[in-house]
Every structure is written in C-alpha cells, then in structure tokens.
C-alpha cells in the first residue's frame, strides 16, 4: 500500500531515494497521515501542509546531526513518521504513546521540545552559536509559522541572530497567503538566484568594495532593497541581517530541494519564506482548516461530523456570558492572544466585532493592552489558557496588579488537559496567581457557578481571575439571571463528622462522591484568594482531619493557602493536601490522569483512610 514509505525507517534511508521518487513518497505519506489521524485524533490540517517541507529537510540535511527545531510542534507528525515512529502513530497522544509535539526524550531527531509558540528561532540560534564555539560544521534550522512569527519573542531572536552572524536558517511556513502563477514563477527564479553561491559571493564582494565609501555602500544597499522589495516582502528580514529568499511554493519539491541545497552551502543567517496550504491533499481540511486543526476520530471518506454536546463546555459558558454581559455593558471588550475558537470567542467576535481584539500570539502584549484599556475606563476581559498566561507573568504583576486595574482574566484549560500533555496543562495558575497582591482568584465548581463568578469578577474594580477546566461540568442547570457570588466565601455542601474535604473548583464533584462513603463534611471553597479564613477556622475546630483537594500543583497551591491560614492562627490540626505532584504529567485520558493522581472518588477515599490509619 505504501511501497516507498514502507522502505523508510530513518532519514538516512530517505536519502537513498531518487529525487524523482519524492513526489510519490509525499503522496504516500499524506495518505498514511490521514488514515492514522482518523483513527487516533490529533492535529491534521497543519500536518498536511508540511509534508513536502519535511521530506525536503530530511533529504537535504544530515539529521539528526543537523538540528531541526519545529516551532509549536503540532505539525511534526510527518517528521515523526520519517524518524522511526511510524508504528507509534497508532498510540499518538495517548497514555504511554508518542507525544503530539517534539520531545527530546522521545527521539534524537527531536532536537528541541516545543509546544508553545515562537521559541524555535531562539533555540536554533543557541544551537548555531554552540556549533561555532565547538568548531563543528552543523546546520541549525528553525521552522516557524506565520502566526508564531507575530510574537515578540520571534523578533527578539531575529534581531539577535543578525548581530551574531550565526549559521542559522529560519524557514517561515506561511499558510496565510497565496501566490498567483506569474508572481510565483518569478519568485521561484529569484529564490534560486538569491540562494545560490554566485549571488551571495557577489553581494559580499560588493559590500567589501563599497565599504571604503560608506555613502556609496548605503546607496547601493537601498537600491538593492528597493528592487527586491518590488517583488519580495523580505526587506524587513534583510534589515535584521538575514539573506531573504522567497516566497516559494512549499509544496513544490523540486524548488524546495534546489533552494535548500543552495542555502546549505551558504554562511551566515538565512531566511527562507515558503507558502503552504493547510489541509493540503485532503479536500475537507483544505476547505475548513480550522475545523480540521485538531480533530477526534473520524472516517476519512465522510470527514469530521461535529457531534452535538449534551451539555455545554465551560468554554461555551464563558462565550455565552461574554455576549450577554456585552449587551448590558458597553465598556466590555474581549481580548484573546490568537485563540478565538479555543477560548469560545467566535460568537462574540461576530456580534461585537468592534469590541473584539485578537492581538495575535502575543500574550505579553494582550495583558498590557488590557491594562491600558482599563486605565481609560473600559472593562477588559482577557480570555486565555492557563498555560499561556504564564508567558505574561511580568505584565500581570507590573502592568495590572501593581496598578490595581480592573482586568478580568478568564482562564481556560485549568488543571489537566489530557492528550496535549505537560506543555499545555494548567497545573500552576493557583500557585503563581495567589502570591500576587490585589488579585482575586476564584474557581467554579459547576456550570452555573462559572457564569455567576464571571459576572462577579466583572463587577469588581480590581484584577480578578476565574479559572475553569477543559471540557464539560457535572451538568448543573445554568441560571440566566446573573448574581453576585459572596466575595471570599465558601459554602458547606455536605455536613459530616470527623473529616472535612475542602474542595477547590472542579474537585467538588469527586469530593461529594467520596464524602458519602467517608461521612465527611464537604466544602465548596470557591475562592483561593481571598480565602474564607473564618470557614477554615470553623472547620478546624469541628473536625479531626482537614483535606484540601485541588487540580493544581500542591506546591504553593490552594492547600498551601489553607496551611498558611492555620499556621498564622497557631492552629495545630492534621492536614492532608491532595493535588498534582511535583512532576510533569504525560498525556493521557483526562479521567485516567485524575485517577492516577488520586483525585477521583477512589483516590480521595484511599488517601484519607491511609492518613487516618497513621
């Protein structure tokens, strides 16, 4: 079924093929990828767009000696297949299976672990400098998408790379533009010309010759930029000190191979701009690359058929609240760092386009942009994943909290996230948020509480974070009427005897289940800051054992807040802290992951009984 692909286990075998065979290999690889992802789920459209590029890179460069650094990394399935992990695709993103992103501990061909965007150029530059210091001729290649290129970190790295004059190749995978045939042909010719040794040598010689007359050099440089600028968009990258080549068709293996082979012979920073199409070769994905960005299992012949959910996900609850709140208050603006679909902002972006701001993959900018808007009387709501808010921690403190500005942070994907693994887990937000002065941190236990907490956060004139998990809640009916949740107050949901389970957010449901068997008092704590200290003291006075349960790292989390409260009052009581342990958790089924962490009904009961037996 796959005559060429079946012969390839590692890139060295790929390099034994004739160039004329590579288009067939691309077809086989694309077919295998569609069939494989259809069985497991995963990222599809982005991977279909990088088939030819992946083949060309491994064909021209001596991997793994030469270093490939894939930005974000969800487009590396073809790379994994060609580097000895084809059989592992059957367990992609599953517990014990291969990851959906590059991981150094998974393969020597994964030169650098990625999953968050815009890190590739910095990492590849570090590798290029290391090669120079170690006096080895080794190529470092960063492959970055047009979305990731919008982040400040990418431009910081470009700026530094040009100054260092390192042997670095940056490949911009641009799937947000198209080339008309005549312009494409012209640019293909220019790519061959500008990536060749003659052009590079002549350019350096001309610079040396004209360097004795600085005004002439500057005039020549501007003339070159003017001519190239008429047919290429690369002047910006030339200003950073790169030799810009492209744009070229990223699905044309002949031009890719020729251009990469030419670039391989050059010294100094090189920038190759390729144009690809997401979903290439699979019509449904080409027509709707957003739908096919991340998919569950599906039948290739039928495509992805969206299944109606029996109850709303927390993301949808947030999106609906945002629209309802916007209708009531014209000061509300919604901000997202390039996560419109994932954060539930599609409806808001359509109903309130003038108040919707997608700032690109720029979390730092998103937070400070919100702070500036808040200074002028607007009420910004920043919709962001827990793992991505980490990238704007300084802005959170310096620009929002110190100035005590009324910015609402709607923190999605708090806690474990399943198949995306440790890079996307929201394991740390309670710990890194609660130590910041002026900020209020709350977490809903169910769908209705999520809506009411968002409303409560919006009414405050101080920084506020509402963190909620991925997926759906326990199925509580949502009240459309919005009400204030008493600030810093928990609620007792079940009265017991010796044991008190202090549940934070999503952990209320398993605590209620465990509470019945343990005859424990179960408390919905609601807030980690301000913590309901009065309730904690009452519980300590009436019980033998307090148990804090949170979907956050134990270190510095909600349980630590309870412990600090007790210590400050000189209360000596047995305390058991349950949460995520001090290690990174691999991908897996969310329910199984919670079980492995001891955060389901069975795990909570087991831990409590073990502590009571001491």
Curated annotation (Swiss-Prot):
Has keyword Transferase? yes
Its UniProt pathway annotation is: Metabolic intermediate biosynthesis; 1-deoxy-D-xylulose 5-phosphate biosynthesis; 1-deoxy-D-xylulose 5-phosphate from D-glyceraldehyde 3-phosphate and pyruvate: step 1/1
Task: Write down the InterPro entries for this protein, in alphabetical order.
Answer: Dxylulose-5-P_synthase (IPR005477), THDP-binding (IPR029061), Transketo_C/PFOR_II (IPR009014), Transketolase-like_Pyr-bd (IPR005475), Transketolase_BS (IPR020826), Transketolase_C (IPR033248), Transketolase_CS (IPR049557)
What are the EC numbers?
2.2.1.7
The terms under GO molecular function for this entry are:
1-deoxy-D-xylulose-5-phosphate synthase activity; magnesium ion binding; thiamine pyrophosphate binding
Subunit relationships: Homodimer.
Chain's role: Catalyzes the acyloin condensation reaction between C atoms 2 and 3 of pyruvate and glyceraldehyde 3-phosphate to yield 1-deoxy-D-xylulose-5-phosphate (DXP).
Entry protein name: 1-deoxy-D-xylulose-5-phosphate synthase
Underlying gene:
dxs
């Amino acid at each position: 079924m796959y005559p060429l692909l079946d012969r390839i286990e590692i890139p060295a075998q790929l390099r034994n093929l004739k160039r004329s065979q590579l288009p067939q290999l691309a077809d086989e690889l694309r077919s295998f990828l569609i069939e494989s992802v259809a069985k497991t789920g995963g990222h599809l459209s982005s991977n279909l767009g990088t088939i030819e590029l992946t083949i060309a890179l491994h064909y021209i460069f001596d991997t793994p000696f030469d270093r490939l650094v894939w930005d974000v990394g969800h487009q590396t399935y073809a790379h994994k297949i060609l580097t000895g992990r084809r059989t592992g695709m059957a367990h992609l993103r599953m517990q014990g299976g291969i990851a959906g992103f590059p991981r150094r501990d998974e393969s020597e061909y994964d030169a650098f672990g990625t999953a968050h965007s815009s890190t590739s150029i910095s990492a590849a530059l570090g590798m290029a400098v290391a090669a120079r210091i170690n006096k080895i001729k080794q190529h470092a290649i960063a492959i970055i998408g047009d979305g990731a290129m919008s982040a400040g970190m990418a431009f910081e790295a470009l700026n530094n790379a040009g100054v260092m004059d390192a042997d670095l190749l940056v490949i911009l995978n641009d799937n947000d533009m198209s080339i008309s045939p005549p312009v494409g042909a012209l640019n293909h010719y220019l790519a061959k010309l500008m990536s060749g040794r003659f052009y590079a040598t002549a350019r350096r010689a001309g610079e040396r010759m004209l360097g004795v007359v600085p005004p002439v050099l500057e005039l020549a440089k501007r003339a070159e930029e003017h001519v190239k600028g008429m047919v290429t968009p690369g002047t910006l990258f030339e200003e950073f000190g790169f030799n810009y080549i492209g744009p070229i068709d990223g699905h044309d293996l002949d031009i890719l191979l020729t251009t990469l082979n030419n670039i391989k012979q050059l010294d100094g920073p090189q920038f190759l701009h390729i144009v690809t199409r997401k979903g290439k070769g699979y019509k449904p994905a080409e027509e709707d690359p957003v739908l096919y960005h991340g998919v569950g299992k599906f039948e290739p012949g039928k495509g992805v058929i969206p299944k109606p959910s029996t109850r709303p996900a927390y993301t949808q609850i947030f999106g609906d609240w945002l629209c309802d709140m916007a209708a009531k208050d014209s000061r509300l603006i919604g901000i997202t760092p390039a996560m419109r679909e994932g954060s539930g902002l599609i409806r808001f972006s359509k109903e309130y386009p003038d108040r919707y701001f997608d700032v690109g993959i720029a979390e730092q900018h998103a937070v400070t942009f919100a702070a500036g808007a808040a200074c002028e009387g607007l009420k910004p709501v920043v919709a962001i994943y827990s793992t991505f808010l980490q990238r704007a921690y300084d802005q959170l403190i310096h620009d929002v909290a110190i100035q005590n500005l009324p910015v609402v942070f709607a923190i999605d994907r708090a806690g474990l996230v399943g198949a995306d693994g440790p890079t996307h887990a929201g394991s740390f937000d309670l710990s890194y948020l609660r130590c910041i002065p002026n900020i209020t941190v709350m977490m809903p236990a169910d769908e209705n509480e999520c809506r009411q907490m968002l409303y409560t956060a919006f009414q405050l004139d101080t920084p506020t974070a509402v963190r909620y998990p991925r997926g759906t809640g326990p199925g509580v009916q949502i009240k459309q009427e919005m009400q204030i949740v008493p600030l810093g107050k928990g609620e007792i949901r079940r009265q017991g005897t010796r044991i008190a389970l202090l549940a934070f957010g999503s952990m209320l449901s398993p605590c209620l289940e465990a509470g019945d068997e343990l005859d424990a008092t179960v408390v919905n704590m609601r807030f980690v800051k301000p913590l309901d200290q009065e309730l904690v003291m009452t519980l300590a006075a009436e019980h033998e054992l307090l148990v804090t349960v949170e979907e956050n790292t134990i270190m510095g989390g909600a349980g630590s807040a309870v412990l600090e409260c007790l210590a400050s009052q000189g209360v000596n009581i047995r305390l058991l802290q349950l949460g995520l342990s001090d290690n990174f958790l691999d991908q897996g089924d969310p329910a199984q992951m919670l079980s492995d962490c001891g955060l389901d009904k069975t795990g909570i009961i087991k831990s409590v009984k073990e502590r009571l037996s001491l």
